[in-house]
C-alpha cells in the first residue's frame, strides 16, 4: 500500500465531486491508464448493498465449496471503506488478455492434448497488473500532491466484478463473468481504492444477455444452478485450481482434457466475437501451454514443474494437484500404449491423491 498520510487516514465524505478540475483529472487518469496498457477505466463509489446481499445468499447455499476465504472477511469484501478506511472512490481498470494461441476447441477435441484456460498460458497477471496499478496510483498522487491509494488484483476481499459493473465497464452475465459490449469477457480487472472523491463514470450498463443461454448449456459439469448463479463445487476451474482434495468421480469424465481452468462458458458467448488479441507480450503462450502434450506434462519432475512454470499462475496449485489434474485427463484420453505407460509410471507415487486419480484413470482404459 502506498501511503501519503501518517497516523489516521483522512476522512473522505462519500460524495462524487463533479467540478471541472476533477473531471479533467478523470480524463487524465484514463490517458495514463491507456499508456500503462489498460483498455478501459471506470470510477464508482462504495455502495454495494445489492451485491452484498447476493454474496451472502450464495455463501449460505454453500456454493463456494472449500473456498472458506470467500466469507472470512465479513462485510469488508462488499464495503470498501471497511477494508481500507477512508475509501470513497474505487478506480476499476480493465486489461485484455486473449492470447494468440492454438484454437481452444481443437485442443479440447484432441484427447492426448491438455487444455489450459487461456488466461493462464502466459505469465502470471497478478504481478503485471499490480505493478501497472501502482504506477498509475503514483502518477495520480504526484498530480494531486496528496491522497491515499491501495491497489488490488484478485488477491484481497474485493468484489471486483461488482465494482467494475457499477463503474460502467460491463455487466455481470449469466455465466457470472463480466462482459463488455465492445470487448467480450477475456480481460483481467484491477482496482485502486482511494480517499480522493472523483466523478463517477456512467451508470452501470443494463444486462445484454437477453434470452441467450449458450453459456449455461455449454458447461460440461452443469455448474450453473440458474442464470447468474454458479455452484463452484461443480465448476472445472474450481476443481482444477482451488479444490485441494479428491475430485468427485462423477465429474472426472466430464472434465475431458481440461487440466487447468475451463473457458467453455466464454468460448460460446456471442459477445466474445468482439474480443481482440492482447498486445501484452507477457500473456503470450509459454512452454506450448496453449497446446501441450499430456504425457509430456505428466513426465515432468517436481523440479521441472517449478522451473518451467516459474512466473506462471499455474505454479501456485502445486505439483501434486498438477499431476492429479493430468491423471484425470489421461483417464479421459484415447487408449494407447503411451498413455498406459505414463499412468503406470505414477502408480506408486508418494502422494495418495495422485495414486487415487492414476488408479481411476487406468480403470478407464480397461
What are these regions (language model features)?
Residues 14-208, 256:
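Auxiliary alpha/beta "docking" domains used to position bulky ligands
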Residues 322, 353-355:
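Positions within the helices of HEAT/ARM-like alpha-solenoid repeats
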Amino acid at each position: 500500500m502506498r501511503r501519503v498520510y501518517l497516523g489516521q487516514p483522512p476522512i473522505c465524505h462519500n460524495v462524487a465531486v463533479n467540478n471541472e478540475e476533477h473531471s479533467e483529472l478523470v480524463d487524465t487518469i484514463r490517458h495514463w491508464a491507456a499508456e500503462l496498457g489498460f483498455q478501459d477505466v471506470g470510477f464508482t463509489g462504495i455502495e454495494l448493498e445489492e451485491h452484498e446481499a447476493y454474496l451472502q445468499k450464495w455463501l449460505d447455499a454453500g456454493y463456494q465449496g472449500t473456498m472458506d476465504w470467500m466469507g472470512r472477511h465479513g462485510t469488508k469484501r462488499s464495503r470498501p471503506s471497511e477494508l481500507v478506511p477512508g475509501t470513497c472512490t474505487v478506480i476499476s481498470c480493465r486489461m485484455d488478455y486473449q492470447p494468440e494461441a492454438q484454437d481452444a476447441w481443437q485442443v479440447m477435441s484432441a484427447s492426448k492434448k491438455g487444455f489450459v484456460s487461456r488466461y493462464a498460458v502466459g505469465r502470471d497477471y497478478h504481478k503485471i497488473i499490480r505493478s501497472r496499478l501502482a504506477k498509475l496510483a503514483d502518477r495520480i498522487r504526484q498530480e494531486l500532491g496528496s491522497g491515499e491509494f491501495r491497489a488490488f488484483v484478485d488477491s484481497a476481499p474485493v468484489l471486483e466484478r461488482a465494482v467494475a459493473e457499477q463503474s460502467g465497464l460491463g455487466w455481470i452475465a449469466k455465466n457470472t463473468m463480466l462482459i463488455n459490449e465492445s470487448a467480450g469477457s477475456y480481460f483481467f480487472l484491477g482496482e485502486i481504492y482511494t480517499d480522493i472523491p472523483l466523478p463517477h463514470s456512467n451508470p452501470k450498463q443494463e444486462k445484454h444477455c437477453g434470452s441467450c443461454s449458450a453459456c449455461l448449456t455449454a458447461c460440461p459439469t452443469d455448474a450453473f444452478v440458474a442464470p447468474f448463479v454458479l455452484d463452484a463445487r461443480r465448476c472445472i476451474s474450481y476443481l482444477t485450481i482451488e479444490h485441494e482434495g479428491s475430485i468427485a468421480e462423477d465429474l472426472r469424465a466430464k472434465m475431458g482434457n481440461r487440466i487447468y481452468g475451463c473457458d467453455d462458458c466464454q468460448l460460446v458467448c456471442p459477445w466474445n466475437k468482439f474480443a481482440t488479441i492482447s498486445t501484452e507480450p507477457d500473456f503470450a503462450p509459454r512452454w506450448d501451454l496453449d497446446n501441450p502434450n499430456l504425457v509430456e506434462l505428466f513426465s515432468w519432475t517436481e523440479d521441472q514443474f517449478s522451473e518451467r512454470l516459474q512466473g506462471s499462475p499455474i505454479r501456485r496449485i502445486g505439483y501434486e494437484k498438477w499431476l492429479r489434474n493430468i491423471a484425470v485427463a489421461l483417464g479421459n484420453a484415447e487408449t494407447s500404449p503411451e498413455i498406459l505407460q505414463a499412468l503406470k509410471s505414477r502408480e506408486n507415487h508418494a502422494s495418495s491423491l495422485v495414486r487415487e486419480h492414476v488408479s481411476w484413470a487406468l480403470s478407464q482404459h480397461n
